Amino acid sequence: MVDITDFFKKTNKADSSQAFNQVRINIASPEQIRSWSYGEVTKPETINYRTFKPEKDGLFCAKIFGPVKDYECLCGKYKRMKYRGIVCEKCGVEVTTSKVRRERMGHIELASPIAHIWFVRSLPSRISILLDMNLKDLERVIYFEAYIVMDPGLSPLHKGDLLTEEMLQQAQNEYGEDNFIVGIGAEAIRTLLAELDLKSLRNALQEEVNNVINSDFKRKKILRRLKLIEDFIGSGNKPEWMIVTVLPIIPPELRPLVMLDAGRFASSDLNELYRRLINRNNRLKYLKKEEDGVPGIVLRNEQRMVQLSADTLFDNGKRGKAVKNSNKRPFKSLSDMLKGKQGRFRQNLLGKRVDYSGRSVIVVGPELKLHQCGLPKQMALELFKPFVYAELERCGIATTIKAAKRIVELGTPDVWNALAKVIKHHPVLLNRAPTLHCLSIQAFEPVLIEDKAIQLHPLVCTAFNADFDGDQMAVHVPLSTEAQLEARVLMMSTNNILSPANGRPIIVPDKDIVLGLYYLTLSIDGEIGEGRLFGSMAEIHHALFNKVVSLHSKIKFRKHIINADGDKVMALVNTTPGRLMLGELLPDGDNISFDVVNKVMTKKGISAIVDMVYRYYGQKATVVFADKLMKLGFKYACISGISFGMDDMIVPETKSKHVNDTLLEVQEFERQYSEGLITSGEKYNKVIDAWSRYTDRVANDMMKGIAAGDQTSVGLTNQERLNSIFMMADSEARSSVTQIKQLIGSKGLIAKASGEIIDRPILSNFCEGLTVFECFIGIPGTRKGLADTAVKTKVSGHLSRKLSESAHGYFVKREDCGTTNGLIITAVVEGGVIVVTLAEQVLGRVAVSNVYCPITKVLILQQGEMIDEYKVELINTAGINSIKVRSVLTCELQEGVCAKCYGRDLSTGKLVAIGTAVGIVAAQSIGEPGTQLTMRTFHIGGAATRGVEASSFEAIVDGRVKIINPNFVVNSNNKSVIMSRSCEVILADNVGQEITRYKAQYGSILLVTDGQEVTKGTSLVAWDPYAMPIVTEKSGYVMFKDMIDGVSVKDIIDESTGIVNRVIIEPKQGRGEVVLRPRICLLDQNKQPLTLSNGLEAEYFLPVNSILSVEEGANVSAGDILARIPREFAGTKDITGGLPRVIELFEARKPKNHAVIAEIDGCVKFGKDYKSKRRLILQPNDECQEPIEYILPKGRHVTVNEGDVVKKGDMLIEGSPVLQDILKVMGVEALGLYIINEIQAVYRLQGVKIDNKHIEVIITRMLQKVEITDSGDSNFVIEEKVNKREVINTNKKLKVKGLREAQYRPILQGITKASLQTQSFISAASFQETTRVLTEAAIAGKVDKLEGLKENVIVGQTIPAGTGFYINEIKKIARQRDKEIIAAKDAELQENNTEA
C-alpha cells in the first residue's frame, strides 16, 4: 500500500520494493501536510520580472521546490552533477534534477482555520451531519454571520444554539459574559468536531435507531449519521481534520508559469488563487499581531475573506458565483483540474497522446493480402527513424547516430534499403476513430508505397466501419518486443475473423465483391453450351477461353460427392462454370458440400461459406480463402459491367390499382368513423396500417418487375435482359428494398419530427418526381433524420461509456465454479413466429445437466459439455424445446466469472480463456451497434418504418391444438370470446411434443377448439389491435352507475363528423364528496343485479379514457363489448425510438405508467377505495401468508376482476413492469431473461445480432450490491447498500467465530449508479461526480485494490487482464515460492542453531 502523494514520485521499475498493489485515500492531518512540505510559502510573488528567477519564499521558490535547471543552484555557485545533493549556502537551493519541481510540495500556515468546502458543500454535507446541524446554520457560523454556543455553562442556552450579534449581546447582559462560551467561524466548528466522542456517539445512535418505529425519515437520518461515524472510526480519520489549519501547495510544475513573446507570461489559474489566499492570510497575520488591537468586525471580515479565497482555490463556484479573471472567465480551481473531460483523470491519465504515431487518409488496397496495409514511405521513415538509425549503424553505413541522422536527411538509397529491412515483420497498429470496439484497432504488416495515403485491405472495412470517402486512420508503432509479439499474436487482422459481438465472420466480402460473386454464380436459361458435360476444371477453363460455354450456362459436371450413407461417390452435378470456379477456391477436403456453392451467391450465403471454412479448416485456410474470394469477386464485378441506369428503374404497372384499393379501404374507415363505430385514434391506426400494407404490396410487385428484367427490348440475350438494380438489391451488395421502393415504388409514410406518422403517404417516387405538397410533407422527416444523427450519436456514445465504466473490472477468473444453477433457454416467439431459435441461443453455451432425445432417449449432451455446431444440429433434429445452460447470471464465483458459465469466446469459437476482459467486450458489443444504427438513419431519408399491428396468431406448422384455462363465452355472433386472463393456446406435433405456445389475451376471439388438427397458416386467435375490449360474461340489461355528465363521463363531439362519443374522464370531486367509480352493472328482467360465476355482482369498472359501446338500458348478450380502451398511437420503430428503451432498462429506471405485478399466488378482492386510488387486496392461497394490499391509481385499467385467481408475477395493471419488482417477486433469473428479451427486441428490429451473454454480463454488474436487512453481529448498518462479495466474506468470518451472520437481499442498480459505487474509488472518480466520490472515499479511508482496468491505467501499471492477468498470476506463484523457500531456510537455520 502506498500514500497517494507517492504518485508524484518516479517509480523505478527494477526496484520491486517500490511496486504497489493497492492505494488508500485519507483526509490529510496537519502534521502529514507539514511532513510532505519542503518549506512554507510566505510571499505571494512568483518570479522576478527583471531576472526571471523565482522569488525566495514565493510560489516558485527554488529553495522550497528545487532548482529550475538540472544540477544548478539559483545563484550559479554550484553547477554540474559532481555537486549533486549539496545545498548552496548562499541561495539555499539543493543541487539536483529540476524534475523534483514536479514532486516537491510547499505549505501555508493559516492564521485562521478554514473549513474544506468539499466537506461543507458536497451534498450531503459531512460536517453538518456529524454535528447534527442544518447546512444553512453551519454556513452562517463558518462565514461569520452567527455565533454558536460551544459550552452553555450556567446559562439556559443549549450547546449548538445559534446567536446573532444582537442575541449574543442580550445573552451576555442577561447571563454574564463568563457564564457561557460561544465561538464563530471554522475555528469554532473545529473545536466542536474535536470534542466529539465517536464511539459513545455510535452506541447512542444504535440505541436510538432501534427505538424509532414510526418515522421513516427520522430513521434514515440517524442511519446516515451512524454510517458516517462508522466510516470515521474505521478509517482512523479525525473529524477535526475536515477543518484545514495548514494548507498544502502543489508542486510548481503542475501549475506552470510560461513566458510568451514580448515578455508576457501565461500562468495557471492556481497561481492567482494561491496568491490571493497568501495575501489575505498575511494580512490577517499582521492584523492579529497589532498591539493596539483591531476591531473584532475587521478581524472577522478578514477571516471570512481567507475562508472565501480557500473555497475558490478548492472548488470555484461551489458556493455562490464563481470568481472570474480579467477576461470574465471563471478561475480553474483544484477541483476543476480533476473533473470533466478536460480534467486530470480523463485528459492526462486515461487518454494520453501517443509517441511514434501518425495519421493519414485511407484508400482501398485490393492487391494487398489480409495481413498487410500500405504505408506511405515518408510516413514510415518518420515513424521508424530510430530503428533506421540503428540499422544504418549496424550495417556500417553510419558510424554515429549524428551521422545516421545526416544520411536520413539526405534520403540516400541506403536509407530506403534500411527502412525496408526494419519494417519487415514489424507490425504496426491501425486505428480508426471512433474506436467503438476492439476491432477498431488491428495490427498489420506494413508494405511501403509511394502514395501519401494509407492503403487498407477491403475485407477489414466492416470491422473498422471504414469507407473511402475521406476517412482517416492513425498508425501506431509497437516498440518493445513484447508489444510487437502481442500485436502479431493477438491483434493481427488475420486473428480477427469473427465478431466478438455475435461470433459471425466479420471479414465477409461486401459491396462490389458480393456483386461480382452474385454475377459469377447466376444461372441463365438459353446460354451457349447449355447441357454440355465436363469432367475437370481444366476443361471448363479451356471451354470458357474458347467461348464454347459462358459463365452462366447450365452444364453437367462429374464430381466426387458424399452420399446419404457418408460414402464418397462420383456423380453428375447440375451446375454452371461460374459456380465451379467459386467451388475451386474451397480448401481441399470433403467437409463442405458442393451444394453450399451450387446456388446464386448473396451476402448471407457468402458469409455462411466463410463461417463453414473457419469451423472446418481453421484460421489460416479462412484467411487464404477470403483473399481469393475477394480477388474473384472484384474481377467479375468488373467483367459484369453492372451499373446503375435509368432504364433499370421500372415503375410497377399495378401501382395505380394498389393506390385505388387502399383509398377505398381508407374511405371505409372514414365512413366507420363518421358513423361513430370507431374513434379518431382507431381510424388513424387503421389508416396507417392500410398504407403500410400498400407500400409492402407495391414493393413486392416492384421487385417482381425488376427481377423479370427488360422484356420489351428486341434482340437482347437473356444475360443482357438482367436488371442491374435488381441484382444489386437481390445480392445484398448495395441498396435495400426500402431505398429502391422510394426510387421506383412509393416513398410511403412519413414521420413528423415528433416521431408520429403522418397518415397521408407520399404516393409518388423519385423516378416520377414528387408534387409540391409531397415534397413539402417529406422535408421535415428528412431533416429529422439528419438531426437525429447528430443528437442520438452523442446519446449512444454516452451509453457505451457508461457500459464500459460499469463492466471494465469483470474478467474470467477460473475454469469452473462448479455451480448446478443456470438459465432455462427456449426459442423466442413473437406473434406466434419463432424469431430466434433455441439452437441460436444455446450455441457456445455449456449444458448444466445431461440432455436426452425426447423420443429415442439417446444422450445428446453431457453435463458440462459445450454446445457446438454439431450438437446444435442434433438438438434441432431431436426437436428439443428447452435446455438449461450455464449463465453469467448464475455463476458462483465471488469475483469475475468462470469460463464454463461464460461459454464460448465468440471471437475465437473456443471456450473463453482465463484472463479475458469479458466486461469490456460486452460493453463494446452492446454500445457499438447503437452508435452505428443512429448514424444509419439518414440513409432512409425520413421514410417511416412501422410494422403492421398483429391482429391474430397463426399456426407456424401443421399440428394439434391444446387449450389451457379455456374460459370463454359464445357471443351473439356465435364467436367464442376468451374471458380468462391466463388462457394459452399450445401447438403440438403428432407425437404431442410442444412446438410453440401463444398467450391469448382477454377479449380475443378463439377460432379453434381443443384437440383440433390445424394446417400451417390457420388462424388460432384473433383480436382488435387498436382497442382493448371490456366484455360481459352474462346476458342482461345495462345500467350505468356513478356516470355523471361533466363529472365522470363526457360527451366528446368530433368536429369533422359531428359524432358523439361518451368517454370516461377523471372524476372532478371536492373533499368530503362521495367517491365516484364509473361502472356498468348488468340487471335481469326484474331489474335485479345479476351475479357472476364467482358469486359477485356483475359490475364492470371503467378506466379513464375508455369509450362506451352500449347505451343505458340496452339488452346485451354474453361476450358482447361494453366499452373499449383505445391503445396508444404507434410511432416509428427505429433504433432512435429503441435506444431510450435500452437506456431505461440499463439505468433500471421506473417506466412511465408502469405495471403492477402480483407478489404472490392468490385471489383478487377489492377493498374500500381512497379518493383517487383503488384498493386491491390479494388473498394468498397459502393460509400462512399475510394478504397483500395494493393501492392503484383510479384512472388506470385494472386487468383483473374480483375473484380472479392470479399467479405470482401476473400483471394487475398493464404497462412495462418495474425491474426492481421483477427481482423482488420473481428472482434474478426471471429478471435476467426479461431484460435480455426487451433489449434484444430493440436490436432485432434493426437486424443487429448481439449474443445474450453480453447483456448477462452487464446485468451481473447491475446486481453486484445487496441491501442489509439484518446486520447480525457485523458492523454493517441496516438498509446499508454493500458489495455482495464484502458481505459474503464478513459472514464467513462471523460463522467461524460462531456469531450471527448479516442478512441481505439483492438490489438492482442502474449502470451509472453501479459505476459510481464500484469498489474502486479511482475508477468511480474518473467517471462522474469526481469531488463527491473522492470526498466519500477520503472519509471512509477507502482502499483501492487496483482490480479493474481503469485504475491500473491511471496509476501506470499493467492491466490485470489478458497478458497482464498471466503476468500477475506468475508473480503470485513466484512470491509464494519465495516465501516457502525463505520459511524453509529460516527453519533450517533455527534447527542448526538448536543443535549448536
UniProtKB/Swiss-Prot annotation:
Cofactor(s) essential for the protein: Mg(2+); Zn(2+)
* Binding sites annotated in the UniProt record for Zn(2+) 1: C73, C75, C88, C91
Q: Which SUPFAM superfamilies does the UniProt record give?
A: beta and beta-prime subunits of DNA dependent RNA-polymerase
- Pfam families reported in the protein's UniProt record: RNA_pol_Rpb1_1 (PF04997), RNA_pol_Rpb1_2 (PF00623), RNA_pol_Rpb1_3 (PF04983), RNA_pol_Rpb1_4 (PF05000), RNA_pol_Rpb1_5 (PF04998)
List residues binding Mg(2+). Answer: D467, D469, D471
Q: Got a GO cellular component term for this one?
A: DNA-directed RNA polymerase complex
Name the UniProt key words of this record, in alphabetical order.
Answer: DNA-directed RNA polymerase, Magnesium, Metal-binding, Nucleotidyltransferase, Transcription, Transferase, Zinc
Name the residues that bind Zn(2+) 2.
Answer: C817, C891, C898, C901
Query: Which family does the record assign?
Result: Belongs to the RNA polymerase beta' chain family.
Which protein, by its recorded name, is this?
DNA-directed RNA polymerase subunit beta'
What is the organism field in this record?
A: Orientia tsutsugamushi (strain Boryong) (Rickettsia tsutsugamushi)
